[in-house]
């Protein structure tokens, strides 16, 4: 495949259901992703074993937004892992000193607001990546999983979509069969 892993980390409830993840899956890439958009359909098609799920569900996010209960600073305070990542944004680890302010802005936004709940999903995202990495190292099993992915994802093919649109939406028949 063109890629072995497809990372689809949109916040649940915020993805407009793009097709990039389908293209990766059609080519055998296994998905590390949230329960959002087309990821849901892909996971149903390929099976739980071929999908590395992580993150909050749409209902949880909506509830936390509605009652203003998400406090990103509390997530930061509870996790040494997240502290290390966040504190690296506040250093010059990623850029020259004159650009540190750009990363500081990201740091402050994530700790004060984090509308998309990045910090809430971050530790689970890391765990999902580690599971995928572990599985990837078993090359024979990974190859089998990639083949299963291709075999199970056919309903997302453009041929099937065009035939279904022709029949159900455009109400036209093929010129020749």
What are these model-derived regions, one by one?
Residues 1-146, 150-155, 160, 164-177:
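Catalytic binding pocket for nucleotide-activated donors in carbohydrate/polymer assembly enzymes
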């Amino acid at each position: 495949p063109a890629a072995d892993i497809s990372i689809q980390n949109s916040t649940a409830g915020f993805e407009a259901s793009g097709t990039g993840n389908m293209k990766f899956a059609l080519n055998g890439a296994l998905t590390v992703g949230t329960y959002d958009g087309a990821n849901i359909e892909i996971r149903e098609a390929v099976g739980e074993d071929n999908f590395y799920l992580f993150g909050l569900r749409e209902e949880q996010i909506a509830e936390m937004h509605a009652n203003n209960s998400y406090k990103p600073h509390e997530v930061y305070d509870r996790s040494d892992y997240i502290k290390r990542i966040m504190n690296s944004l506040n250093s010059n680890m990623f850029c020259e000193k004159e650009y540190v302010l750009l990363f500081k802005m990201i740091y402050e936004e994530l700790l004060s607001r984090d509308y998309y709940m990045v910090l809430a999903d971050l530790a689970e995202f890391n765990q999902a990546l580690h599971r995928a990495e572990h599985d990837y190292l078993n090359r024979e099993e990974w190859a089998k999983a990639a083949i299963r992915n291709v075999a199970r994802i056919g309903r997302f093919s453009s041929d099937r979509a065009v035939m279904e649109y022709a029949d159900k939406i455009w109400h036209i028949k093929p010129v020749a069969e």
